[in-house]
Swiss-Prot record:
Keyword Cell division among UniProt keywords: no
Keywords: Aminoacyl-tRNA synthetase, ATP-binding, Cytoplasm, Ligase, Nucleotide-binding, Protein biosynthesis
Record note on domains: Consists of three domains: the N-terminal catalytic domain, the editing domain and the C-terminal anticodon-binding domain.
EC number: 6.1.1.15
Source organism per UniProt: Heliobacterium modesticaldum (strain ATCC 51547 / Ice1)
Reaction catalyzed: tRNA(Pro) + L-proline + ATP = L-prolyl-tRNA(Pro) + AMP + diphosphate
Similarity comment: Belongs to the class-II aminoacyl-tRNA synthetase family. ProS type 1 subfamily.
Subunit comment: Homodimer.
InterPro entries xref list: aa-tRNA-synt_IIb, aa-tRNA-synth_II, aa-tRNA-synth_II/BPL/LPL, Anticodon-bd, Anticodon-bd_dom_sf, Pro-tRNA-ligase_IIa, Pro-tRNA-synth_IIa_bac-type, Pro-tRNA-Synthase_IIa_type1
Protein name per its UniProtKB record: Proline--tRNA ligase
Gene Ontology cellular component terms for the protein in this record: cytosol
Top EC group: ligase
Subcellular location, record wording: Cytoplasm
Gene Ontology terms: biological process: prolyl-tRNA aminoacylation
Length: 575
C-alpha cells in the first residue's frame, strides 16, 4: 500500500469529544470517524487492525474445535420472551417492530438465537459436544456512549457457545476456551489478567472469568494477589474474614445528632471512628424493600446483595421509600426496631458490640448497639467491596488493586437457556436431557482500543507487531531524490514479496511531517531511506517501541527486518 493512496485522514489537534487516549489517537491517526453517538466508521487502517485481531481469534477458536457460522442481527421477541430477558434487559435493548407490528430486537448477544438454532437441529448425544461461534456487530442502547470504542452503541464481538451432555463436559469446554483466550491476548501482545467475575445479565449458575487488559484508564477495578494466583473483579472479590471479638456490651442509648446525616458527620460529632458505626441502607429489590448493613468504613457491593436476594432488579431506595421504613429518612436509618422489612448484614456488623447506628428518628442516633441483642437479621453474608491491603482469601497475603479494561469473558451457563427454550438431546438410553451450555465472548473492537490504552506514548500509538495495521513503513526522506525513491521502491517491493505487510510513504511531504505521521500511526518498524544511502550505502531502521535505531546495508535490510518481525511476534508479554 502506498500512503499517497491510503484513506487515512489525520488530525493535528485532539478532538474535543475524545476523553480517553485510545479515542483521541484512533481519531487523530485516521483509524475511525464518528457516525453518530457511540457509532463509528472503521477506516482502512482501523479495519486492518480489526482483521488482524479477528484472524488470531479465528485461529484459536478453530484450534479449540469451534465451527464458525453467522447468526442474524435482528432477533424475534418470541425467543427473548421465552428466556425471560425481553423485559429484564431494560432500556439498553434496541427494540423495533416490522410492518406487521411484530416485535424484534437488535442483538446485544446471541444466547437465545443459538439455543433456538441448536434446539431445532441437534437431538442426539452423538452430536455433542458442539462449539459454534461467530464474529459480528452487536448493539446496545447505551444511555451515554463514551470513551470511543470502549462503550459504544455498535461494537464488534466474537461469541462462541458450547453445548455439552453434562457438567463435566461443560467444564472441559470452558477450560479449552479459557486457554484459547489466554493464547489470543498473548498473541495480540497485551498484558492482561484473567479474573473471577460475576455472570451479570447473561446469567447462569456456574463460574465466570473476565480477561482484563491492565491500563490505568480502565473503567473496571480488579483485586489480585502477588503471592498466589487469586484475581477477581471488585464485584466478585472476597478477602479472608478478619472479625475480632468486640468489647463487652453496654446498654443502648439514644443521643441527639442534629443535622448529622452522613457517616463522616456523625463520626466527627460523636468522636468515633467510621469502623465503629453501622452503615444502614434500604434497597428496592424487585417489588420489595430490604435493609442492608455494613460497617461504616466499608462500601456496599450491590452485585453481592443482588445475588444473595436472587432478585432481577435492585436499586437504592428513594428518600420517600426510606421514610416508609423510618420517620427519620435516609440520614437517620438504623436496624433497631425495624420489623416491617428483612434485614441482611455483613459478618463484620454482627461482630460489633458497641456500634453507632441511626435511631430511626430525626436528629438522633443510637450508641452501644449490639447486633443480635438489639436487632435480628434474616441472613449474614459478605456484602461489601474488598479494599487493598486486606488478606487474600486463598493465601492471606495482602491484596492489591489495579485498573483494567474487560476485553473478554467466559461463562458457565449451565441449563439456564436450554431449560427456558427446551433445548434437549437424547442420551445413550434414549432419555431426554437438557443440554449444558457455556458462552465465551471477545470484544474485538474493544480489544483494538484497549491495545492503544496500554501501548502508546506522547507521540502516538505503539502497536504490538501482531495487530499493527502494517508491520513496516518505508520512508524516503526526499521524493525529489531519484536514488532514494528508487531504493525505497525496491525495498518496499522486496518486503511485499517476502509476505511482509508494508506501507510506502510516497507523499511529497517534508521528512518531519512523514516522521510525525509515522509515530502517530504507530507502525512497529520504520525504514528511512535518506542521505546515508548515497554516502554509505545504508538505510536507517527504527523501532517504534523503545525508539531503538540502527543502520543496515541496502542489501541486508530486508532480512534484518524480517528477523526483527519474527522476534517481536514471538515475544510474550507478562500477564
Amino acid at each position: 500500500m502506498r500512503m499517497s493512496r491510503l484513506f487515512a485522514p489525520t488530525l493535528r489537534e485532539i478532538p474535543a469529544e475524545a476523553e480517553v487516549i485510545s479515542h483521541q489517537l484512533l481519531l487523530r491517526a485516521g483509524f475511525i470517524r464518528r457516525s453518530s453517538a457511540g457509532v463509528y466508521h472503521y477506516l482502512p487502517l482501523g479495519q486492518r487492525v480489526l482483521q488482524r485481531i479477528m484472524a488470531i481469534v479465528r485461529e484459536e477458536m478453530n484450534a479449540a474445535g469451534g465451527q464458525e457460522l453467522l447468526m442474524p442481527i435482528i432477533q424475534p421477541a418470541e425467543i427473548w420472551l421465552q428466556s425471560g430477558r425481553w423485559h429484564v434487559y431494560g432500556d439498553e435493548l434496541f427494540r423495533l417492530k416490522d410492518r406487521h407490528q411484530r416485535d424484534f430486537c437488535l442483538s446485544p448477544t446471541h444466547e437465545e438465537s443459538i439455543t433456538d438454532l441448536v434446539k431445532n437441529n441437534v437431538s442426539s448425544y452423538r452430536d455433542l459436544p458442539m462449539l459454534l461461534y461467530h464474529i459480528t456487530n452487536k448493539y446496545r442502547d447505551e444511555r451515554r456512549p463514551r470513551f470511543g470504542l470502549m462503550r459504544g452503541r455498535e461494537f464488534i464481538m466474537k461469541d462462541l457457545y458450547s453445548f455439552d451432555r453434562d457438567e463435566a463436559g461443560l467444564h472441559e469446554s470452558y477450560m479449552k476456551m479459557y486457554q484459547a483466550y489466554v493464547n489470543i491476548f498473548r498473541r495480540c501482545g497485551l498484558t492482561f489478567r484473567p479474573v473471577e467475575a460475576d455472570p451479570g445479565a447473561i446469567g447462569g449458575t456456574g463460574g465466570s472469568h473476565e480477561f482484563m487488559v491492565l491500563a490505568e484508564s480502565g473503567e473496571a477495578e480488579i483485586v489480585y494477589c502477588d503471592a498466589c494466583d487469586y484475581a477477581a473483579n471488585t464485584e466478585k472479590a472476597e478477602c479472608k474474614p478478619q472479625v475480632t471479638p468486640g468489647l463487652p456490651p453496654l446498654p443502648v442509648e439514644q443521643v441527639a445528632t442534629p443535622d448529622q446525616k452522613t457517616i463522616e458527620e456523625v463520626c466527627n460529632f460523636l468522636k468515633v471512628a467510621p469502623a465503629d458505626t453501622i452503615k444502614t441502607m434500604v434497597f428496592r429489590a424487585d417489588d420489595d424493600l430490604v435493609m442492608a448493613l455494613i460497617r461504616g468504613d466499608r462500601e456496599i457491593n450491590e452485585v453481592k446483595l443482588k445475588n444473595l436476594l436472587g432478585c432481577l432488579d435492585l436499586r437504592m431506595a428513594t428518600e420517600e421509600e426510606c421514610r416508609e421504613v423510618s420517620p427519620g429518612g435516609a440520614g437517620f436509618l438504623g436496624p433497631v426496631g425495624i420489623e416491617e422489612i428483612p434485614i441482611y448484614a455483613d459478618p463484620e456488623v454482627m461482630a460489633m458490640t458497641r456500634a453507632v447506628a441511626g435511631a430511626n428518628a430525626p436528629g438522633a442516633h443510637l450508641i452501644h448497639v449490639c447486633p443480635g441483642r438489639d436487632f435480628t437479621v434474616i441472613a449474614t453474608a459478605d456484602l461489601r467491596l474488598v479494599q487493598a491491603g486486606e488478606p487474600c482469601p486463598q493465601c492471606g497475603a495482602p491484596l492489591k488493586k489495579a485498573r483494567g479494561i474487560e476485553v473478554g469473558q467466559v461463562f458457565k451457563l449451565g441449563t439456564k437457556y436450554s431449560k427456558a427454550l427446551n433445548c434437549t438431546f437424547l442420551d445413550e438410553k434414549g432419555q431426554e436431557n437438557l443440554m449444558v451450555m457455556g458462552c465465551y465472548g471477545v470484544g474485538v473492537s474493544r480489544t483494538m482500543a484497549a491495545a492503544i490504552e496500554q501501548n502508546h506514548d506522547d507521540n502516538g500509538i505503539v502497536w504490538p507487531m501482531a495487530i499493527a495495521p502494517f508491520q513496516v513503513l518505508v520512508v524516503p526522506v526526499s521524493n525529489k531524490d531519484a536514488a532514494q525513491m528508487e531504493a525505497a521502491e525496491a525495498i518496499y517491493k522486496e518486503l511485499i514479496a517476502k509476505g511482509v505487510d508494508t506501507l510506502l510513504d510516497d507523499r511529497p511531504e517534508r521528512a518531519g511531517v512523514k516522521f510525525k505521521d509515522a509515530d502517530l500511526i504507530g507502525i512497529p518498524v520504520r525504514i528511512t531511506v535518506g542521505n546515508k544511502l548515497a554516502s554509505d550505502g545504508v538505510v536507517e531502521v527504527k523501532l517504534r517501541r523503545g525508539g531503538e535505531q540502527f543502520t543496515a546495508s541496502r542489501e541486508d535490510v530486508v532480512a534484518q527486518v524480517q528477523a526483527l518481525i519474527r522476534e517481536q511476534m514471538e515475544a510474550t508479554p507478562v500477564s
